Design a protein with these regions (language model features):
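Structural/interface elements that position substrates and couple domains in central-metabolism enzymes
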Residues: 2-74
Length: 74
């Protein structure tokens, strides 16, 4: 696996029914930042839970390179 500093970074805007599955799948292989303005949704994702319950906690855990933020400056 590549070092985090040389790994490709992917950003996905919106953690809804389209964005979150993308973050989870890409996050299994590359650093992926999921951004959403809903801080509660971001907090749930950071805790390893999909607020819409479409993605299992196990799938969320497998996305080891996924990060979640409500701060556009990160």
């Amino acid at each position: 696996m590549k070092d985090r500093n040389t790994m490709t970074t992917i950003a996905v805007v919106g953690l809804g029914y389209v964005g979150l599955p993308l973050v989870v799948e890409f996050g299994k292989h590359s650093r992926t930042i999921g951004f959403d303005i809903d801080a509660a949704k971001v907090a749930a994702c950071q805790a390893g839970h999909d607020p819409s319950r479409e993605i299992s906690d196990e799938q969320m855990r497998l996305a080891q390179h996924a990060e979640y933020s409500a701060d556009a400056l990160e």
